[in-house]
């Protein structure tokens, strides 16, 4: 059937996105110039709301395309300038290098990470202990590595194990699609598969929350952490210590929540690994171990040594984070024999789309700065007493981060806090406390929905999610106990423990305040 050019354009525009979504984006593109001609301020806020909409609808269409169109139009109609965007990108180069090189570097260490999570899954029989181990392992890894990569590894383990059992249970071997359950005629096998799905769902959610618990602690745990650390002129250890009054109690309560939901089988947790599934997986792992060559074993040892280098280099701030990631790429690929250009190129596939999206974030940030969009909000917050400022920043960040991407939210608020410092509206001490409130408020409540955490969104959009019946609603439900506990404990710590604990660490000379002019000159 022949279609018109109009129909062809409608099909091509934003690909497989729903028709209503395409119409909405076109309406935004038409309305924005009209509103801008009447009021640049309201047009700017409209753009921010539209951009948050594209982030919230990430499952309908990846936000790079619709968000990029909105940002491109904003430049054309004069809401910001290419020079301003270039300045924001240049100022955040370290973050871009983190996403490009660190994520790619960890890609080449996947064998080691797969080995670790596989041994955890098969050697720990208690589901409670296993859940705690997955949560703790994900938290530790996310404190030094990108959370997206950690979740990608856990997904790889889960897909592999699901495929092994599904092929054996269906009796069709590798020719049967993992989504095809038609050959599972035995009710016992079907029941075991359903239980296995629930088991994998709970482990993946524990690991996902673990990435948030660990990722909030360090400057490399999440991209926005690095932006906040750069503005405050904090290095790895100082960032870790300044966050500790909030992140350590939240971490402990998060681990306690993990125990309770498993112990009492709440919110979809508590499913055990069926015995027949465990036996099949153990047999497969035994065969894999026996067939592992000395070359394979040496690769694992090399990756472990490079992991030690990575942690040490980050802890002692031996170089910029992105450059440390590049060193990981060079060391692992050269010592493990990965020299094919196409194999190396695959390592960058996960990070580059998000890197491009982050650049679009910076375009929207440029609009916010040029149009002074957050000035009324910041003035409202700054008119409050200093202790209430921390609470309001935490709550505003948390609310937005639960429905929008936390990198975008964190970037916007730390820019506004930095502007308040430079104008003399707040003191250096208050700015540093606000930076902690912004970082924790951005990271902790964002586990509420997949929109806030890139790792959660990656899990939801992965090929594994439909196999284990992990829907958007189920993900929100399973994250609910963690959301409530982490958000409330974080808020209480910001109100009651942050300032006295920071003062105590200063008295112990664990923290030192840099000269105000140094902080001002080192920001973005």
From Swiss-Prot:
InterPro entries: Na+/H+_antiporter_NhaB
Keyword Membrane (UniProt): yes
The entry's keywords: Antiport, Cell inner membrane, Cell membrane, Ion transport, Membrane, Sodium, Sodium transport, Transmembrane, Transmembrane helix, Transport
Topology relative to the membrane: Multi-pass membrane protein
Subcellular location: Cell inner membrane
Coiled coil: none
Predominant location category: membrane
UniProt catalytic activity: 2 Na(+)(in) + 3 H(+)(out) = 2 Na(+)(out) + 3 H(+)(in)
Transmembrane segments: 23-43, 44-64, 97-117, 120-140, 144-164, 203-223, 236-256, 304-324, 354-374, 392-412, 448-468, 476-496
Keyword set includes Secreted: no
One MF term in the entry's GO annotations: sodium:proton antiporter activity
Any one annotated GO CC term: plasma membrane
Family: Belongs to the NhaB Na(+)/H(+) (TC 2.A.34) antiporter family.
Function: Na(+)/H(+) antiporter that extrudes sodium in exchange for external protons.
Name of the protein in question: Na(+)/H(+) antiporter NhaB
């Amino acid at each position: 059937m022949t279609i018109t050019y109009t129909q062809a354009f409608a099909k091509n525009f934003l690909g497989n996105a729903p028709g209503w979504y395409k119409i909405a984006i076109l309406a935004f593109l038409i309305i924005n110039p009209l509103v801008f001609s009447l009021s640049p301020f309201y047009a700017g806020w409209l753009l921010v709301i539209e951009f948050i909409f594209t982030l919230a609808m990430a499952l309908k269409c990846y936000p790079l395309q619709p968000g990029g169109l909105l940002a491109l139009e904003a430049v054309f109609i004069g809401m910001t300038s290419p020079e301003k965007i270039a300045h924001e990108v240049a100022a955040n180069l370290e973050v871009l290098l983190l996403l490009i090189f660190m994520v790619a570097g960890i890609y080449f260490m996947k064998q080691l990470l797969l080995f670790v999570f596989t041994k955890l899954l098969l050697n720990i029989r208690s589901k409670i202990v296993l859940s705690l181990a997955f949560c703790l392992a994900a938290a530790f890894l996310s404190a030094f590595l990108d959370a997206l990569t950690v979740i990608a590894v856990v997904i790889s383990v889960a897909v592999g194990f699901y495929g092994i059992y599904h092929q054996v249970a269906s009796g069709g071997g590798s020719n049967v699609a993992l989504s095809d359950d038609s050959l599972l005629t035995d009710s016992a096998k079907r029941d075991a598969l359903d239980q296995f799905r629930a088991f994998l769902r709970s482990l993946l959610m524990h690991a996902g929350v673990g990435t948030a618990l660990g990722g909030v602690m360090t400057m490399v745990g999440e991209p926005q952490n690095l932006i906040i650390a750069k503005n405050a002129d904090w290095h790895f250890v100082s960032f870790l210590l300044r966050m500790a009054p909030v992140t350590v109690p939240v971490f402990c309560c998060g681990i306690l929540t993990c125990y309770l939901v498993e112990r009492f089988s709440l919110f979809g947790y508590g499913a055990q690994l069926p015995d027949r599934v465990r036996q099949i997986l153990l047999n497969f792992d035994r065969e894999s171990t026996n067939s592992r060559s000395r070359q394979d074993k040496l690769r694992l040892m090399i990756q472990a040594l490079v992991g030690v280098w990575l942690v040490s280099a980050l802890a002692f701030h031996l170089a910029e984070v992105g450059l440390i990631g590049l060193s990981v790429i060079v060391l692992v690929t050269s010592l493990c024999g990965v020299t094919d250009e196409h194999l190396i190129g695959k390592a960058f596939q996960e990070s580059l789309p998000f890197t491009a999206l982050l650049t679009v974030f910076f375009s929207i940030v440029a609009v916010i700065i040029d149009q002074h969009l957050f000035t009324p909000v910041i003035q409202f917050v700054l008119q409050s007493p200093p202790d209430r400022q921390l609470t309001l920043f935490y709550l505003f960040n948390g609310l937005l981060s639960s429905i929008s991407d936390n990198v975008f939210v964190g970037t916007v608020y730390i820019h506004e806090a930095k502007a308040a410092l430079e104008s003399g509206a707040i003191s250096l001490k208050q700015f540093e406390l606000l930076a902690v409130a912004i970082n924790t408020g951005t990271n902790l409540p964002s586990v509420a929905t997949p929109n806030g955490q890139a790792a959660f969104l990656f899990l939801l959009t992965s090929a594994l999610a439909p196999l284990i019946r992990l829907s958007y609603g189920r993900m929100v439900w399973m994250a609910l106990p963690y959301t409530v506990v982490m958000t409330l404990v974080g808020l209480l710590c910001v109100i009651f423990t942050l300032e006295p604990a920071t003062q105590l660490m200063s008295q112990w000379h664990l923290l030192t305040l840099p000269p105000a002019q140094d902080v001002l000159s080192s920001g973005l």
